[in-house]
From Swiss-Prot:
The keyword Cytoplasm does not apply. It comes from Saccharomyces cerevisiae (strain ATCC 204508 / S288c). Gene3D superfamilies: Aldolase class I. PROSITE patterns: UPF0034. Keywords: Flavoprotein, FMN, mRNA processing, NAD, NADP, Oxidoreductase, tRNA processing. It catalyses: 5,6-dihydrouridine(20a) in tRNA + NADP(+) = uridine(20a) in tRNA + NADPH + H(+); 5,6-dihydrouridine(20a) in tRNA + NAD(+) = uridine(20a) in tRNA + NADH + H(+); 5,6-dihydrouridine(20b) in tRNA + NAD(+) = uridine(20b) in tRNA + NADH + H(+); 5,6-dihydrouridine(20b) in tRNA + NADP(+) = uridine(20b) in tRNA + NADPH + H(+). This is tRNA-dihydrouridine(20a/20b) synthase [NAD(P)+]. The lineage of its organism: Eukaryota, Fungi, Dikarya, Ascomycota, Saccharomycotina.
Amino acid sequence: MHTMHIPSGDVLIPKPKLITEETDPLHIIKTRQKTHGRPVTIAGPMVRYSKLPFRQLCREYNVDIVYSPMILAREYVRNEHARISDLSTNNEDTPLIVQVGVNNVADLLKFVEMVAPYCDGIGINCGCPIKEQIREGIGCALIYNSDLLCSMVHAVKDKYGDKLRIETKIRIHEALDETVELCRKLCDAGVDWITIHGRTRRTRSSQPANLDAIKYIIENISDKNVPVIANGDCFKLSDLERITKYTGAHGVMAVRGLLSNPALFAGYTTCPWGCIEKFCYWALEFGGLPFQLAQHHLYCMLENMELKKSLLKKMMNLKNYISLIDWFNKTFEFKRYGEDGFGMGVEIPYKANSCVQRSASVVERQE
């Protein structure tokens, strides 16, 4: 597998990628319940972290659709370095939704033209609550500017039709009828599906997502026949059924839950060891992932597995991929790609000389 970086400079931009039933995110969203007996599962956009190696990992564990991190359109269309660093993909990275932060039609259309050959859909970020983004008219600012948001959706659908899917990921308003009105306008503008994060602009992630709000919105736009995905507080497989049955959503988008346990949609209650081996392999195989980002991914997964804190600290003190792999080899039965059992482990495979560490870890869990 080779990664594909988006071309830079004055080059001929290919036509949009050909959508098939197997890669069409809208078709998957509408039919997953019938074909797989479950709602659709989606790995949402994660700032810096939903890069190619992690997307590949999520796909291994029953994730149907995966998003890129948010990419700022104004930087991407004007800056060659942004195009090199912001998006890498390959032929197996599908269905892929590229999320964009944008505040005008011109930048959006140019951005879509550049990324459409490499993805299956575009997601407009209307949910980021960061003040700097809101000041730029990006993210959450767009749910208060429905005319601009709908004009951007309409412009993309007018140019590409069903050759490219477009989604909006929104937060809810304090007054839910405002969100209903926004969603109805988006449906009329041609949006293919809407993802609703069940929190307002000011709601902290520590507060529960408002599933009643998502349910209310879905009930009041049901005549539009546009699928809705619920986002917020999905941390285990049972949450998928619980959230969709309660709200009426077609599926669930998980973010924080997948960051710590990429296998949650496969029914694992904690991150299996196989995720560690696979992620390390893909991070090195694909290249381009800064070491500190890989380190953070591994920290989240190993913390979820309740690895001893002293070992987590040792890992976080490492400075490069070479020392990281050496540490894994010395501390665990760490399998490489091609070896029997690679990526199949569940429990942490401490080496025999690490039995003291293992015992200490068990005691620490009990405490």
